[in-house]
């Protein structure tokens, strides 16, 4: 699936405010849709939370935007620039002596509740994340550039 944009609406994405914009995430179809004034502006494939790490269903709004966000939970332990323990959940895996935690990159992060947000990441075609909504990088940037703090986000089954 590719991200589609309605050309005649493209310029509307750059205007300030949240009026008329919303993001709808469909967990069933594994896609995110960006609307403006009720019309589809863009559609992108996603990867939502895998079993046991479910993406929360509900009505939210964008509460933080961070173009170069890093996870505060998932990542690697690094010592002297070298990874000494990879793919850790720092709440569960003790930090090796002399190492520091380096969170996994989450570019174009749009937080919508707690520890959950939309961001660029691997999209294998099925739910595979730790709960966030991953989009291909170019689509994540498009959504990031189009929305503002306060933009509604609906996550539905």
Regions found by a protein language model. Give the residues of each.
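Solvent-exposed coil/turn segments that connect beta secondary-structure elements
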Residues: 28-30, 37-40, 49-51, 65-68, ...
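A short, polar/proline- and glycine-enriched secondary-structure boundary/capping micro-motif
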Residues: 36, 44-45, 53-55, 73, ...
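Short amphipathic alpha-helical segments with coiled-coil-like heptad repeat character
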Residues: 40-43, 149
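Soluble periplasmic/extracytoplasmic beta-strand elements of cell-envelope proteins
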Residues: 22-26, 31-35, 45, 61-63, ...
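Short, solvent-exposed cationic patches
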Residues: 60-72
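C-terminal motif of bacterial Sec signal peptides marking the signal peptidase cleavage site
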Residues: 1-2
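Exported/periplasmic cell-wall-interacting domains
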Residues: 5, 16-18, 57, 76-157
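N-terminal post-signal-peptidase region of extra-cytosolic proteins
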Residues: 9-22, 27, 42-52, 57-60, ...
């Amino acid at each position: 699936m590719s991200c589609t944009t309605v050309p005649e609406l493209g310029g509307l994405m750059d205007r300030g405010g949240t009026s008329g914009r919303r993001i709808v995430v469909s967990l069933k179809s594994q896609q995110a849709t960006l609307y403006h004034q009720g019309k589809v502006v863009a559609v992108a494939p996603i990867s939502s939370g895998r079993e046991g790490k479910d993406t929360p269903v509900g009505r939210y709004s964008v509460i933080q935007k961070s173009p170069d966000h890093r996870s505060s939970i998932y990542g690697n332990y690094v010592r002297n620039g070298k990874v000494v323990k990879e793919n850790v959940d720092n709440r569960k895996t003790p930090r090796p002596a002399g190492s520091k935690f380096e969170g996994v990159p989450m570019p174009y992060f749009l937080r919508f509740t707690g520890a959950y947000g939309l961001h660029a990441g691997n999209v294998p075609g099925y739910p595979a994340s730790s709960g966030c909504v991953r989009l291909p990088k170019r689509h994540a940037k498009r959504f990031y550039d189009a929305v503002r703090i306060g933009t509604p986000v609906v996550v539905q089954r």
